[in-house]
């Protein structure tokens, strides 16, 4: 192949989905993304990557069914033949059906062979002639060969039907995945937002897994089981009709037990899962927002709520354990009772035959009937759970098909509609538009909105939050259609315009930027539609969005991956990328929804200048709370309560003295002198041109959100050790972890279990009884078979039949009692231990420092596994798992002791087969489990692609990325599908071998046993004691090996839990030299003295460089400065989320960096930049801010909400303060969430209040009300605010100007205007004076 030189950027995507490196090739005329297969199909054909930077690059080219489940099963056939099935699918289904039927027949045939072998043994026992011995040897050899032939056929049939059904399920699941994604990605926003929270994830993960599980090898197993059942009864009725008829009663007994028990287990398990999930949600939110939890010392309140949900689940957990134990006890009782009945009736029939002197009923015939019917009935009872699986699969397919077959009301992939609308040339008109969101149909959002948007002009929409501004934008993008009224461009209705064409003419920047988990280059380039010139356009757009500087400063530049939801970037950085994505397509209509809200005033001014240049040739619609960004608009529309109250230019609206004029008055920073304006005007031009300014724009923004370590605007996070003190503490913890022995872990784990040891001991005692009962059964079984020999008298046969039938029934009662008592004891113990571990784990996690949470690649998700994974694994080992282990161990030891003591010569030959049977049992269970787990894990990343697309559905729709997202999803499916198919072929071979190999061991046992009996070394009774005692018990012990992964997980979990619970928090460690206590006063003072600080994960970039500020008690102070200068980090120091590398943080005269404990936080309240709500009522979220130990009254909560201007909004809700908040609080607007955060801080009645951009999302009126409330705190509360809106802090007693980690200037607003050109420039940028 000939080499090709291509100019551009080539790099390898680091996270390939299917194991093949994913490549992205960008030339100046094309953008290509794909793996090796994709590129080899193209003309370029790259084989390897030779560069990763800009230059000329040469490339060498189980559950039980209910009545509803049974009803749903009738839809199962529609599932198998749904979604464009092919002839290959039909052939696989037919082949799987026929092979499964054939696979059920060999087992009854083996029952006949084994019964004939017993008759042969009876013959040689009754006659000791040489001829009888020779005949026996010949007969045994023939029958052993039959067993071998049947086993081989059985292996082939099982492998064939398992493979066929696995292929059917994988092909069907892939079709469902593709079609569901294709449908969901093109649905309108109204439908997506009407779905319950997590519905799409549930459909993709749960429902498609149900479809896959319900059409997999389980179908073949059920069909073969039904075939086995039918064949078994045919054989039984041919052999001994009377006993067969009696044992028919076993079938309904098994089914009644399974149906009744399964119904209640499902009921209690559902309730249990609901409450545990609620508790897990609390834990997840707490870990995700740890800084807020620490700020309010809310550990105890959240732990109490977490424990409350777990306590509510206790009753259902106990009921579930009791029901499961009773079900298991009934299962064994029915099986042993059926044995007692069958052997007793068989003994009477054989006794009568002997008394009458005819052949009649033979022992072998009785054995065959019991062997095949008890086993068939037992196995058939195991079919019951699969009925639920199949019904669930049918129900899941119906739910999926509802979406798959649903036509989208606003389809962005359709080619229908008008494509001639002249965007940028004609007016856009709203004409009497009314609208309500589907989630709130009783709340009108727009009520007769009418206004025009002139072409190639800038129209700004302003007004209070919740007034309907963003809804206007949503209608322009046609995320929704109006309930009534029209949106027109010229004379064309938006409803009649092709959706893809409409959105292709619009550039859209959301209030909360949405980025996909791709590179920066791709995220910006997604704004292009059918454009070949990419790289230059992307760079130009990035420059216009003031993003080029920080992008090129990143280690991988435009090739940097932004992470899930852009979490590798700061808020300002994401906003600039989103802006560049909108600008790159050079739209006819540019929509900006608070596009510069996260930027400082200088950055905002530079971007605003670029937008002003763009608006000269583009129709621009902007939404803004900062009126400084809207005052130069050609037209301003004031939207209030869903209506247009005013419209006109800035000058006109101010002169009218209406709503807009009042908003301007509230935001105006004060009138500067003419000289100030002239000087500042000259300075602006100079400042915009200086390298220092651009450097400031690229500075990192530290501690951006309140729940994680902050990500700068210039680097992607990399884990690095922190300062020397924290580093030494971490090393000490690692050393303690290494020195903790297995004995220490065991002792600590035992201490966790000790309070419930009596339940565990009771369960262990029952396990010993259960394990011993298997050996007892072998003894009874051997004597029963021996007592039925026709060589004995009729009276002896009848007498012993009564005795051993009674013994079997006694065993049934013992098994029932032991399983019920043991199951309940273990279930209760496991639940209590699990509760204790989960609560202690959450307590320890919330008690660790922020630094600990950020080290060693810890994330909220991985830490949550202590509660969900490790606690469950450790709790499980204290439950039925340990009981099963002990029972199987007793069973195996008892079997070996009995076998060697009764017939050691038989045992010594069969003993080497024990590992074979153990591995057989292990593989049968393990392969089935691994196939299910592999399938689930393989498609996890493909599911993540869908979740990302749905979470960012507005961005996907706005930039017409539906087809591109579908292609990404298709690539994500390709590798996992191939891997799963490959695993199916070799996995099913192990499964078939596991089901078949035990028959060969039985053949060896009968051959060797018959040889020993024929030679007179052992009796038939001894042989039939040894065989079940050794082989049956050994085969059941294979479960012990299948439990090995669970045991291993429990061991690892035990070590993890002990390490967590014994890890001391650094908050409890005090540096010698300070032991002062805090003295309450009316307000709190604070000083930062020569503070130096570097974030642990960015040691090469100091954030604070000798910061000195002095906050006097009772003052209102403000921190201002460019993004990344260290303002939020200052708050982190005051809250002691981190300890400084050097310097002191003094609060009320006490250096808190040297102080033990966190009691000082009781007098501090924080309003973080990110508005965070926890799952719970509104009242709970507000009360969370109260001081530890104090439960605020309803009056205190309402007072705080009134001060935050949110009380009236809460009272309009149907449930008022008892309204439930979701974990993300999405049912509230951004401004409402911010006001709830402020109320949470105010209910604390703090002496020091920290406000980090606390009014950035508020309208002017709400901002005014909160400013008034803060004014009432003067004197008794020290207030420190970080703000980009300078009008919110211009009355501050002291303003600290922070730049590059230092305080470069301080003073009042008027003093800084006179002394600081930087501050004066920011004031002028935000001034609304004309």
Curated annotation (Swiss-Prot):
Compositional bias of kind Basic and acidic residues: 722-733
Topology of the protein relative to the lipid bilayer: Multi-pass membrane protein
Induction comment from the UniProt entry of this chain: Expression is induced by voriconazole exposure in vitro and in mice. Expression is increased in clinical azole-resistant isolates and by the presence of itraconazole. Expression is also up-regulated during biofilm growth. Expression is repressed by iron in an SreA-dependent manner. Expression is down-regulated by tetrandrine and posaconazole in a synergistic manner.
Span of domain ABC transporter: 428-666, 1086-1325
KW Ribosomal protein (keyword) present: no
Pfam families in alphabetical order: ABC_membrane, ABC_tran
Superkingdom, natural source: Eukaryota
Record keywords: ATP-binding, Cell membrane, Glycoprotein, Membrane, Nucleotide-binding, Repeat, Transmembrane, Transmembrane helix, Transport
GO BP term, pick one: transmembrane transport
Ranges that cross the membrane: 90-110, 144-164, 218-238, 243-263, 324-344, 370-390, 761-781, 806-826, 871-893, 903-923, 989-1009, 1023-1043
Localization of this protein: Cell membrane
Domain ABC transmembrane type-1 intervals: 94-392, 761-1049
Molecular-function GO term, any one: ATP binding
Region (Disordered): 717-736
Catalytic function, reaction form: itraconazole(in) + ATP + H2O = itraconazole(out) + ADP + phosphate + H(+); voriconazole(in) + ATP + H2O = voriconazole(out) + ADP + phosphate + H(+)
Cited function: Pleiotropic ABC efflux transporter that confers resistance to azoles such as itraconazole and voriconazole.
Protein name: ABC multidrug transporter mdr4
Species of the source: Aspergillus fumigatus (strain ATCC MYA-4609 / CBS 101355 / FGSC A1100 / Af293)
């Amino acid at each position: 192949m000939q080499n090709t030189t291509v100019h551009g950027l080539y790099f390898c995507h680091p996270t390939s989905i299917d194991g093949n490196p994913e490549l992205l090739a960008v030339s100046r005329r094309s953008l290509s993304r794909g793996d090796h297969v994709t590129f080899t199909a193209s003309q370029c054909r790259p084989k390897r990557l030779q560069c990763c930077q800009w230059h000329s690059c040469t490339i060498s080219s189980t559950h039980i069914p209910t009545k509803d489940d049974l009803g749903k099963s009738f839809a199962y056939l529609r599932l198998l033949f749904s979604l464009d099935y092919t002839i290959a699918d039909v052939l696989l289904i037919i082949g799987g059906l026929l092979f499964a039927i054939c696979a059920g027949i060999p087992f009854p045939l083996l029952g006949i062979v084994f019964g004939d072998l017993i008759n042969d043994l009876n013959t040689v026992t009754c006659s000791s002639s040489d001829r009888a011995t020779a005949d026996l040897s010949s007969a045994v050899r023939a029958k052993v060969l039959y067993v071998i032939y049947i086993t081989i056929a059985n292996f082939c049939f099982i492998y064939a039907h398992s493979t066929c059904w696995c292929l059917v399920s994988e092909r069907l699941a892939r079709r469902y995945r593709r079609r569901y994604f294709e449908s969901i990605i093109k649905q309108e926003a109204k439908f997506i937002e009407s779905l319950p929270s997590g519905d799409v994830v549930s459909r993709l993960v749960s429902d498609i897994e149900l479809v896959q599980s319900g059409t997999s090898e389980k179908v073949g197993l059920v069909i073969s089981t039904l075939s086995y059942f039918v064949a078994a009864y045919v054989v039984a009725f041919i052999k001994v009709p009377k006993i067969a008829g009696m044992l028919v009663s076993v079938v309904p007994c098994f089914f009644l037990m399974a149906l009744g028990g399964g119904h209640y287990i499902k009921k209690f398990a559902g309730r249990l899962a609901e409450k545990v999930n609620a508790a897990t949600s609390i834990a997840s939110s707490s870990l995700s927002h740890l800084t807020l939890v620490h700020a309010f010392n809310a550990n105890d309140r959240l732990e109490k709520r977490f424990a409350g949900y777990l306590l509510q689940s206790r009753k259902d957990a106990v009921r579930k354990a009791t029901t499961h134990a009773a079900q298991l006890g009934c299962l064994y009782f029915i099986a042993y009772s059926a044995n007692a009945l069958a052997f007793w009736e068989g003994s009477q029939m054989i006794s009568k035959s002997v008394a009458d002197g005819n052949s009649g009923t033979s022992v072998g015939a009785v054995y065959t009937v019991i062997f095949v019917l008890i086993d068939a009935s037992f196995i058939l009872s195991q079919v019951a759970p699969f009925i639920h699986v199949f019904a669930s699969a049918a129900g899941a397919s119906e739910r999926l098909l509802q979406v798959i077959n649903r036509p989208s009301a606003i389809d962005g992939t359709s080619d229908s509609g008008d494509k001639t609308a002249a965007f940028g040339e004609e007016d856009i008109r709203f004409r009497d538009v009314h609208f309500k969101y589907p989630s709130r149909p009783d709340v009108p959002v727009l009520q007769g909105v009418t206004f025009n948007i002139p072409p190639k002009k800038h129209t700004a929409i302003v007004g209070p939050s919740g007034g309907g501004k963003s809804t206007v934008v949503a209608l322009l993008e046609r995320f929704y259609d109006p309930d009534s009224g029209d949106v027109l461009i010229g004379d064309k209705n938006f409803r009649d315009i092709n959706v893809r064409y409409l959105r292709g003419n619009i550039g859209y920047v959301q209030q909360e930027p949405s980025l996909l988990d791709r590179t920066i280059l791709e995220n910006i380039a997604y704004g292009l539609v059918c454009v070949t010139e990419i790289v230059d356009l992307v760079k130009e757009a990035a420059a216009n969005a003031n993003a080029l500087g920080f992008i090129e400063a990143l280690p991988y530049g435009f090739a940097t991956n932004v992470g899930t939801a852009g979490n590798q970037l700061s808020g300002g950085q994401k906003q600039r990328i989103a802006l560049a994505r909108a600008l790159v397509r050079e739209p006819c209509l540019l929509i900006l929804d608070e596009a510069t809200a996260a930027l400082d005033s200088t950055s905002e001014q530079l971007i605003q200048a670029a937008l002003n240049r763009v608006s000269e040739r583009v129709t621009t619609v902007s939404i803004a709370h900062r009126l400084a960004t809207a005052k130069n608009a050609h037209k301003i529309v004031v939207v209030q309560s869903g209506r247009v109250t005013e419209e006109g230019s800035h000058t006109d609206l101010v002169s009218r003295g209406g709503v807009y004029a009042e908003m301007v008055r509230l935001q105006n920073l004060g009138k500067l002198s003419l000289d100030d304006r002239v000087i500042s005007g000259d300075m602006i031009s100079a400042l915009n041109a200086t390298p220092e300014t651009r450097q400031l724009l690229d500075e990192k923004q530290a501690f951006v959100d309140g729940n994680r370590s902050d990500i700068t605007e210039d680097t992607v996070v990399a884990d690095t050790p922190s300062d020397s003190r924290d580093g030494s503490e971490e090393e000490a913890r690692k050393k303690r972890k290494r020195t903790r022995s297995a004995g220490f872990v065991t002792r600590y784990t035992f201490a966790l279990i000790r309070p419930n040891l009596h339940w565990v001991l009771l369960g262990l005692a029952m396990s010993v009884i259960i394990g011993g009962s298997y050996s007892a059964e072998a003894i009874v079984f051997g004597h029963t078979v021996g007592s039925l020999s026709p060589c004995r008298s009729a009276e002896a046969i009848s007498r012993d039949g009564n005795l051993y039938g009674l013994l079997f029934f006694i065993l049934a009662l013992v098994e029932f009692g032991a399983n019920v008592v043991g199951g309940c004891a273990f279930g209760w113990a496991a639940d209590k231990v699990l509760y204790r571990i989960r609560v202690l784990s959450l307590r320890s996690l919330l008690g660790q420092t922020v630094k600990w949470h950020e080290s060693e690649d810890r994330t909220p998700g991985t830490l949550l596994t202590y509660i969900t994974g490790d606690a469950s694994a450790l709790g499980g080992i204290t439950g039925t798992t340990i009981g099963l282990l002990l029972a199987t161990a007793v069973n195996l030891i008892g079997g070996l002791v009995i076998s060697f003591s009764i017939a050691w010569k038989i045992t010594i030959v069969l003993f080497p087969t024990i590992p074979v049977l153990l591995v057989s049992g292990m593989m049968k269970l393990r392969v089935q489990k691994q196939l299910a787990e592999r399938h689930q894990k393989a498609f996890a990343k493909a599911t993540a692609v869908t979740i990302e697309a749905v979470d960012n559905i507005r961005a996907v729709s706005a930039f017409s990325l539906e087809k591109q997202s579908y292609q990404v999803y298709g690539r994500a499916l390709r590798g996992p599908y191939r891997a799963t198919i490959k695993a199916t072929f070799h996995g099913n071979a192990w499964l078939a071998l596991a089901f078949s190999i035990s028959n060969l061991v039985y053949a060896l046992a009968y051959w060797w046993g018959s040889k020993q009996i024929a030679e007179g070394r052992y009796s038939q009774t001894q042989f039939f004691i040894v065989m079940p005692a050794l082989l049956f018990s050994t085969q059941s012990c294979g479960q012990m090996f299948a439990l090995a992964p669970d045991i291993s997980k429990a061991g690892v979990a035990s070590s993890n839990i002990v390490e967590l619970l014994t890890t001391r928090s650094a908050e409890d460690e005090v540096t010698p030299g300070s032991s002062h206590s805090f003295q309450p006063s009316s307000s709190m003072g604070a000083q930062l003295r020569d503070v130096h600080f570097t974030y642990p994960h960015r040691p090469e970039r100091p954030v604070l460089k000798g910061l000195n500020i002095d906050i006097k008690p009772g003052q209102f102070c403000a921190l201002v400065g460019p993004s990344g200068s260290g303002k939020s980090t200052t708050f982190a120091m005051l809250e002691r989320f981190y300890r400084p590398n050097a310097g002191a943080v003094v609060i009320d005269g006490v250096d808190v960096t040297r102080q033990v404990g966190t009691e000082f936080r009781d007098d501090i309240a924080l309003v973080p930049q990110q508005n965070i709500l926890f799952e719970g009522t509104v009242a709970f979220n507000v009360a969370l801010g109260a001081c530890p130990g104090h439960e605020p009254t309803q009056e205190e909560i309402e007072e705080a909400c009134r001060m935050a201007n949110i009380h009236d909004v809460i009272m309009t809700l149907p449930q008022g303060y008892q309204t439930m908040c979701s974990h993300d609080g999405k049912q509230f607007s951004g401004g409402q969430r911010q006001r709830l955060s402020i109320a949470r801080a105010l209910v604390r009645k703090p002496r020091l209040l920290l406000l980090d951009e606390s009014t950035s999302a508020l309208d002017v009126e709400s901002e005014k009300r909160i400013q008034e409330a803060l004014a009432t705190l003067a004197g008794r509360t020290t207030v420190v605010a970080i703000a980009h809106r300078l009008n919110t802090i211009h009355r501050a007693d002291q303003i600290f100007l922070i730049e590059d980690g230092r305080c470069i200037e301080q003073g009042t607003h008027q003093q800084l205007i006179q002394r600081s050109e930087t501050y004066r420039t920011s004031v002028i940028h935000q001034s609304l004076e004309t």
